[in-house]
Amino acid sequence: MRIMVVDDDSERRIILRQSLEQAGHEIVAEVRTAMNLPRLVVELQPDVIIIDTHSPDRDTLEHVVVISQDAPRPIVMFSADNNSEKIREAVRAGVSAYVVDGLAPSRVQPIIDVAIARFEELQALRGELQNAQTELADRKTIERAKGLLMKRKNVDEQEAYRQLRKMAMDENLKLIQVAEEIIRAAKILL
């Protein structure tokens, strides 16, 4: 697994590097700050990002947000800060696993595994949400097109839907595509 490490403490970075290498991981980058993190993530394409910090600062969390939006991947944060608000901020920013007190070499791999599992679950939920939102928007568009057909052709809802389906089949298009065309045509005519 390709891992990027962000840690301003050279001693901890060495411990982390040794733990990761012993587990068979490739360290693609070791950086002291999160300053250029979004750019480096795009360039180096790590599978996982590990951030070791005394306490996550605003800049680090903002960079995590950018990564989570533009190039999502599991992010593990080791920190000495056990403030519950800081933990919530980090998780909201996109941290998959926030670990307080303990960069023990034996714990690194299980923590990475948890972060990956949590990240994959969250990505699946986001995908489901996106699909549901798209489906709802499509239904609204189809209903609107149906309403236009009902009004224009003076037919009932069932007949308008049948005509929409027939147009889609005749043109070898999806129902939503036909509905969008009807709405566009209606805008032009009005």
Regions found by a protein language model. Name each.
Residues 73-82:
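A short, hydrophobic beta-strand element within the central beta-sheet of small alpha/beta folds
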Residues 33-37, 47-67:
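Conserved phosphotransfer microenvironments
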Residues 1-11, 16-20, 49:
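Conserved acidic segment of CheY-like receiver
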Residues 127-190:
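C-terminal output/effector regions of signal-responsive regulators
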Residues 85, 103-112:
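C-terminal output helix
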Residues 24-33:
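Short hydrophobic/Thr-rich beta-strand motif most characteristic of the beta2 strand and flanking loop
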